[in-house]
Design a protein with these regions (language model features):
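Bacterial N-terminal signal peptides
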Residues: 6-14
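Tandem repeat scaffolds
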Residues: 17-157
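Positively charged n-region of N-terminal signal peptides that target proteins for export
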Residues: 1-5
Length: 157
């Protein structure tokens, strides 16, 4: 029985290791070159990273922590940002067309001149975000977001 458990653990580790090392290699590549198209960066810790102008088209950033990262001018077209934390991140001028942003946390993020394209902002957390483009939603969306802010006592006046 002990042999079976040990074999199971070793098999699990050996299968998980290549994916982990690939993710680490992609993270290093991104930080060194700011080029990481279609990379697997899922779950990556990129807090406070300077990724201005980075090319992350088609990258998998699901569950990644990009809190307070500088992504100004970054190309995130078609990226998977499902469940990613971009709390307080600077996304000024970033391209997010076709990105999957369900459950992404954009609270307190800077979104000036962001191009969301056809990304559905109604499935992301935008409370406290600054500079949300008018094209990001309908009047009803902005009203709802404002009401949520008011209920939380976050209104300025």
């Amino acid at each position: 029985m002990k042999l079976f458990i040990a074999a199971t653990v070793l098999t699990t580790i050996s299968f998980a290791h290549p994916a982990l090392s690939e993710s680490i290699a992609h993270t290093r590549q991104l930080l060194a070159t700011k080029q990481c198209q279609s990379c697997d960066l899922s779950g990556a810790g990129l807090v406070l990273a300077n990724l201005s102008g980075a090319n992350l088209t088609g990258a998998n950033l699901s569950g990644a922590n990009l809190s307070r990262a500088n992504l100004s001018g970054a190309d995130l077209t078609g990226a998977n940002l499902v469940g990613a934390s971009l709390f307080g991140a600077n996304l000024t001028g970033a391209k997010l067309g076709g990105a999957q942003i369900a459950g992404a946390d954009f609270r307190d993020a800077y979104l000036y001149n962001v191009s969301f394209g056809d990304a559905d902002v109604n499935v992301a957390h935008l409370q406290g975000a600054i500079g949300i483009p008018i094209a990001a939603g309908k009047a009803e969306d902005f009203y709802r977001w404002g009401m949520l802010q008011g209920q939380k006592g976050d209104s300025q006046g």
